[in-house]
Amino acid sequence: MTDNTPNAEPRYRARFYFDPNSIGMADRDSHYLLYGYDSVANPILRLEIRYSKGNYQLRAAARNDSNGWTNSAWTTIGDAPHFIELDWRAASIAGANDGSLAFWIDGAQVASSSGIDNDTRRIDTIQLGAVAEIDAGTRGTYYFDAFESRRVSYIGP
């Protein structure tokens, strides 16, 4: 799914339901489920899934102005539907370093990163699905539902 409705957004919130549906992945295989792109198709927001020691795990990340990534910790999810929400915010001005990324799974905040120097970043397009770096050992079908995005307010389940 591609969402072209964002328009150089300094803040972007997205919520959707995700079910791994027993997708086959080799241990430590990972790929990206969501990318948020700027106006020239550089990814600046991402959500990654991996399979580790028999568990599915998710982590979110925001790109800074030096092209580095601020990653959340990996959070284990069960093989069932989950409600996922992300709140990405660009820094307010150059030098403020007050950009942030918050991440919820099933209504519980699992990560919050702040102090990100990303004042030059803006969200222009979102892709949701198996968007990048799918390993050869990954096979099957997972499910997404009820995607919603906003500029500011919490969306919830």
Spans of features found by a protein language model:
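Secretory/extracellular carbohydrate-interaction modules
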Residues: M1-A62, S149-G156
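Surface-exposed loop/edge segments in extracytoplasmic proteins
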Residues: A41-L45, N67-A73, A108-S114
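Carbohydrate-binding surfaces in secreted/extracellular proteins
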Residues: F83-G115
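Extracellular carbohydrate recognition
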Residues: A96-W104, I134-A146, Y154-G156
